[in-house]
Amino acid sequence: MGGKAQNGEDEARGKVLSSLPPSLVPYAELMRVHRPLGYYLNTSPYVVGVVFGAAVAPTKLPATILLDRLLILVLWSLFLRSAGCVWNDVIDMDLDRQIARTRLRPLPRGAVSSWNAVMLTAGIFACGGSLLSFLPRECAIEALIEIFFALLYPFGKRFTDFPQLILVNIGWAIPMSMHSLGLDPLAYKKPTFFMFLFIALVIVMIDVVYSRQDTEEDMKVGVKSMAVRFKHSIELLSYAFFYASTGALLAAGYYSGLGIPFTVLSVGGHFGGFLYFLKTTGVGKAPQVESYAKLACLIASLFWVVGLFVEYYLRV
């Protein structure tokens, strides 16, 4: 089963990359266009943030406004994710050469120069930044915070056992999405805090589980991570993040005054989707972790959004 799943993933990646001109393939690899999991994880918080903002806003927001903000923020998240991946490979090139799963990436194998990769990073960030002119000023400040942590992240694994905590910054998608709708997150302090915390816990949980597949090699080359630090209690840690994220989502709904649709669909979908992920992967032991993570994230995020959308739709 695991071998078939892995072969399926490799085939899908091959189809994506083979559809591009050969000269662009290494750059597409740097941007991880063939690895949709990261795009799910970076895009879904903005989608959730917009629908969450719509569900808690004092008046019912026009659907056209929501769709406009969704388009801009989803595009921003794609640029942010792509630039972060390229930058990560620039900083990690010496480490990637020593790890089996990463040693054939474009920079370690010499398909792209470091200078070109740095220029690509800057260009992608610039393209993403151009979108911010269509959003309120507060969104630009939050985007700068996200960029700062995206640039910082690859250094974390060299100096701390907790680099995954830097990924907490992805939770900034919630206040940024609310600001894009003209809402002040500070006017909804508890709901915003718990939704931010929810997103942060989910992202860290997935990254910790995903990192487990590299634990042995990471230890050999000196890469630090929570998966390495807690290698003997990774199941306990992962389930702690899972239950804490469920509690945070419940709290966000409670303090927002959201009702049964949110609790049943958003919270229930999250609980079922990621419990399935942890069980089927053995908390990162199974070889098809990425495949199950994509499925769990897709299912759970759909339920997050559907529950919030129903709450928005039912408003008078």
UniProtKB/Swiss-Prot annotation:
It is a multi-pass membrane protein. GO terms for molecular function: 4-hydroxybenzoate polyprenyltransferase activity; geranylgeranyl diphosphate synthase activity. The gene is nvfB. Coiled coil: none annotated. It is found in: Membrane. GO terms for biological process: novofumigatonin biosynthetic process; ubiquinone biosynthetic process. It holds the Pfam family UbiA. CDD domains: PT_UbiA_COQ2. Disruption phenotype: Completely abolishes the production of novofumigatonin as well as asnovolin A. Pathway: Secondary metabolite biosynthesis; terpenoid biosynthesis. Keywords: Membrane, Transferase, Transmembrane, Transmembrane helix. It catalyses: 3,5-dimethylorsellinate + (2E,6E)-farnesyl diphosphate = (3R)-3-farnesyl-6-hydroxy-2,3,5-trimethyl-4-oxocyclohexa-1,5-diene-1-carboxylate + diphosphate + H(+). The keyword Signal does not apply. This is DMOA farnesyltransferase nvfB. It is an enzyme of class 2 (transferase). Its EC number is 2.5.1.-. Belongs to the UbiA prenyltransferase family. The chain crosses the membrane at residues 47-67, 71-91, 115-135, 139-159, 162-182, 191-211, 234-254, 258-278, 294-314. The lineage of its organism: Eukaryota, Fungi, Dikarya, Ascomycota, Pezizomycotina. InterPro entries: Prenyltransferase, UbiA_prenyltransferase, UbiA_sf. GO terms for cellular component: mitochondrial inner membrane. The keyword Transferase applies. DMOA farnesyltransferase; part of the gene cluster that mediates the biosynthesis of novofumigatonin, a heavily oxygenated meroterpenoid containing a unique orthoester moiety. The first step of the pathway is the synthesis of 3,5-dimethylorsellinic acid (DMOA) by the polyketide synthase nvfA via condensation of one acetyl-CoA starter unit with 3 malonyl-CoA units and 2 methylations. DMOA is then converted to farnesyl-DMOA by the farnesyltransferase nvfB.
